[in-house]
Structure formats: structure tokens, C-alpha cells
Amino acid sequence: ERDIYTIHSAYREDMRIKGFQFGKGEKSACIVGAARGNEIQQMYICSQLVKALRELENNGCISAGKQILVIPTINAYSVNISRRFFGVKEADINRSFPGNDYGEPADRLTNALLTEIRDYVYGIQFTSFYRPGEFVPHVRMMETGYQNTSLANLFGLPYVVVRKPVPIDTKTLNYNWQDEMTAAFSVYTNQNTQIDEVSARQAVAAVLRFLKRMGLIRYESHSGYISHVIYEKDLSDVPANRAGIFRGKVHAGDDVRYGNEMAEIIDPYDGTVREKIL
């Protein structure tokens, strides 16, 4: 365990970004958890990875000459007070990269973090979407020209989603990691603010599976899914045309066909169905 970066405060305990290092040698894989204060699931998954990797290291199962770094959270201040964003200016840490060493606290934090982790061969970030919702666990990548969907398939999750970046995406960790020639992956599970054990175990297994397939650890695992690569531009929104109470009829990952009822919009006063979403 070691400190990656410290933010000093006059009125509260210093915020230390802690990293857990396993193995010695080439900077092979870095795993980053919660960047926002409500990403409890992401921090929990990293804690379970620390637990698993510590056990593997004690059993001599980290490959020689390979180093793995796990950072459970880079925004402990916001986690402690249950605020999504950082500091009095409500900065989004995952929209503050690459940062600089002379600006606002969020910029100094992201600059110091990226300086520390930019040389890793593989970068894995557990993050949350900018909109709330329910997800099938999947790997998401930026279409920067450096992305490698074949590597993303090695996580063994159901889907790999490739997104063409818009200007705001250039401030994310994933984009800036790729800009530093790190093979970067963002992993999404189906919860943020609370722990979902099923998808958390799936995420831990996916990362350990990836590390094994890249030759970083010795670990027995099942092969997982044959991932389906999806481009975000090929996805479609299904809008509701009426206001009211949304009642879903299916969940993320369910099989649906054209014409199937996916949800209802309920009148909030008399309970009648205003619209069926097909």
C-alpha cells in the first residue's frame, strides 16, 4: 500500500489517494475505481480485487517482472459526504483530465494521478454513466484510433461498446490514458450508489480473467462470454411521448422483439395507462 497523491486541507483530514501494488517490475496493469462520490459499487469492486490479488500474491501467483496497481478511489472526500462531484466548485474528476500542476485542486489531482499511471500497459477504470440507468455489465472504449476491441473481448463480458468521442470526452481518464498509448478500458456494472453482489462478482472475475489472459497472473477461471462488439452510433433511443409514471416491463439484458411491450406510462392521478412503449 502506498500514497499516490495527497491533498492538504486546513479544516479536515488530508485526502490521500491510496494505491495497492502487487508484484514488481514492468508497469503492466492499473485499475482505478471511484472518481465520483456516489460510485460505491466501483470502489467495492476494487476492494474485492485488492483482496483477491493479495491472496494470489501470497501464493506466488503474480507473474515475475509484472506490476499491478489498484486504486480503489481517487475522490475519497466526495465519497465521505455522499456528493457526486468534488469540492465546493462541484468539479467532475472524470471530466478534469489531463489537468495541470498549478490550477484548481481537481486539475492538480488529475495531473498528479495521470503522471503516476500513464506508463502502464493496460488501464482499467470502473466508472459510471453520465445518466442514471440499468446496465448489462460491459466494457466501453473510446474510438481514438488506438482502441483494440480484440483486447476488450478478453474480459469475457457480454458486450464491448465503442463510442466515438465528443469534445467533452477528451477530458476523461479513458481518453487521456489512450492518448498516452495505454490500452484503456472502462468497465460498467449495473449499479453505482449501492452494492450489487452479482454484477460485482462478475466484474471481479472479468478483470482477473483479463489479467490471466495477458499473462500477468496465474489463475484458474471459466472463459466467460464471447463478447459482442457494438458501436454506440448503432444504438437507438426509445422515447416516451407522454408524461407520467414510468413502469418498466423488461430489464437490461432481456431478449425483446419488434412490437414487444417494454414499458408503460401510468397516469399519476388515476392510474390509467397513458402509453405503452413498444
Task: Annotate each PLM feature.
Residues E1-L278:
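Structured catalytic-domain cores with a bias toward divalent-metal coordination
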